[in-house]
């Protein structure tokens, strides 16, 4: 009872100090870079020294609840070993996990040897070290497992989308790394390398992107969402397997949530239940994704994971002209479920800019009533578009005018977000513009949990 009173007291205090920029289109003018893509000889693309040294090391959650980690890397000269040696900071006894190796071809490109190994039965809230490679080219990294799932478990997620490998991309990643909020896991909302923008989908750019992001993703998990630039369906060069490079390189624990595809799945982490959806896989009635999501939402236990977060690539609400209403078909299928199950927030990318919505829904339409305008709905999620991480150096600045009522704040700049869960009732979201100091919040808002504290948090 004392804990509940304390939470309510905190809720009352935070209710008074909500800070945000509601109903605003920012007039901030960003500086432009003359050169957009970082050249292949950039230091961030540097190949680690040594024969067959592991590179492009990255990790992601390897099970449903955070007690496993998928370790992935590439060796270029020969297969080497897919074994991972790991140990906890508290106990130096090394264990070994064995994985699998694969390769692929794409047009005239042959991949290196891609390794995926899952380490299991990890302890919660523990620092682990791990090593990959053999003999003189062994490389060592570390990560911290999440706390056990629970009602009032604090945890901080970073939000990055449409990263690419431009100079702006590098600024975004540096800002995230230097943030005083210290994100613990990245929720990545799609469009990774943009290799498909280069001649013949030059897959060398998958390798450079893997080396570029290693400085973060080798040390904390990134939760992957597939975007349109991962599709790489290119019949003109006889490449007709959708998502081929992405699927070989980036594994996710989709089977742990009874999904039949790596493009939609869920995980639990700390106090959040995170659902990843695919904007570019079938989602109509009766499709595998539709059927899975219907069952998945029923399984969410807000008494265990109070925060319900959805990730997708194409936004359902967007007031920029670019990609305007592209998410409409998915919205008509899933929005009513988001309202019914009181999803707290939906993060998307695709649009190369930032936008935060009010809590709105557009689910009242019937052919007899003509109601087709979004209305305020405190059971609905906030929709945040954060596809502004840098891509290939192009920002989407052409906005729908006048600003729709559902749009609370929007700005055509590059940046990243932070979703900082405090307890079962409150979380703080901030968006950080690249051209500000790392501690400056260009937009911020307190979230009140839709299940535990469903008061009006409009801005």
Swiss-Prot record:
Annotated active site residues, numbered on this chain, are 323
Q: Which residues bind Fe cation?
A: 162, 191, 194, 352
Its required cofactor(s), as named, are: Fe cation; Zn(2+)
Could you name the domain of life of the organism this protein comes from?
Eukaryota
User: One Pfam family name from the record?
Assistant: Metallophos
Give the E.C. number(s).
3.1.3.2
Q: What is its main location?
A: secreted
Q: Does the keyword Metal-binding apply?
A: yes
Q: Where does Zn(2+) bind?
A: 191, 228, 313, 350
Which stretch is the leader sequence?
1-22
Q: Where in the cell is it found?
A: Secreted
Of the GO CC terms on this record, one is: extracellular region
Q: What class of enzyme is it?
A: hydrolase
Q: Which family does it belong to?
A: Belongs to the metallophosphoesterase superfamily. Purple acid phosphatase family.
Outline the subunit composition.
Homodimer; disulfide-linked.
- Please state what the protein is called: Fe(3+)-Zn(2+) purple acid phosphatase
């Amino acid at each position: 009872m004392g804990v509940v009173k304390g939470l309510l007291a905190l809720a009352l205090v935070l209710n008074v100090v909500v800070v945000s920029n509601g109903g605003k289109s920012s007039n901030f003018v960003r500086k432009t870079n003359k050169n957009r893509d970082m050249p292949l000889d950039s230091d961030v693309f540097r190949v680690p020294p040594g024969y067959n040294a592991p590179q492009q090391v990255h990790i992601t959650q390897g099970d449903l609840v955070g007690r496993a980690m998928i370790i992935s890397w590439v060796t270029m000269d020969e297969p080497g070993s897919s074994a991972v040696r790991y140990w906890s900071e508290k106990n130096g006894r090394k264990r070994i996990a064995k994985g699998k190796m694969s390769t692929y071809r794409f047009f005239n490109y042959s991949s290196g040897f891609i390794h995926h190994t899952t380490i299991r039965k990890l302890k919660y809230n523990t620092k682990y070290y791990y090593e990959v490679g053999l003999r003189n080219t062994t490389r060592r990294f570390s990560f911290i497992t999440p706390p056990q799932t629970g009602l009032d478990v604090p945890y901080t997620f970073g939000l990055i989308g449409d990263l690419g490998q431009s100079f702006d991309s590098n600024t975004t990643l540096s800002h995230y790394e230097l943030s005083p909020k210290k994100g613990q896991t990245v929720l990545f909302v799609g469009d990774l390398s943009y290799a498909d923008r280069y001649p013949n989908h030059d897959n060398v750019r998958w390798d450079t992107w893997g080396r570029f992001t290693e400085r973060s993703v080798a040390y904390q998990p990134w939760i992957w969402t597939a975007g349109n630039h991962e599709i790489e369906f290119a019949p003109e060069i006889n490449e007709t397997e959708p998502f081929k490079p992405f699927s070989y390189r980036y594994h996710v624990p989709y089977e742990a949530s009874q999904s039949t595809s790596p493009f939609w799945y869920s995980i639990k982490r700390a106090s959040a239940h995170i659902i990843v959806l695919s904007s570019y896989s079938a989602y109509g009635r009766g499709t595998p994704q539709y059927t899975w999501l219907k069952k998945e939402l029923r399984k969410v236990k807000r008494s265990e994971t109070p925060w319900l977060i959805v990730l997708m690539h194409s936004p359902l609400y967007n007031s920029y002209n670019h990609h305007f209403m592209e998410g409409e078909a998915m919205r008509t299928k899933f929005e009513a479920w988001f309202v019914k199950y009181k999803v707290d927030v939906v993060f998307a990318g695709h649009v190369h800019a930032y936008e935060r919505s009010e809590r709105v829904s557009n689910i009242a339409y019937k052919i007899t009533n003509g109601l087709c305008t979004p209305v305020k709905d405190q059971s609905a999620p906030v929709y945040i578009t954060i596809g502004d991480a840098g891509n290939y150096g192009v920002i989407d600045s052409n906005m729908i005018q006048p600003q729709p009522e559902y749009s609370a704040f929007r700005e055509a700049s590059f940046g990243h977000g932070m979703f900082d869960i405090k307890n079962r009732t409150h979380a703080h979201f901030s968006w950080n513009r690249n051209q500000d100091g790392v501690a400056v919040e260009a937009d911020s808002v307190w979230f009140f949990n839709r299940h535990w504290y469903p008061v009006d948090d409009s801005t």
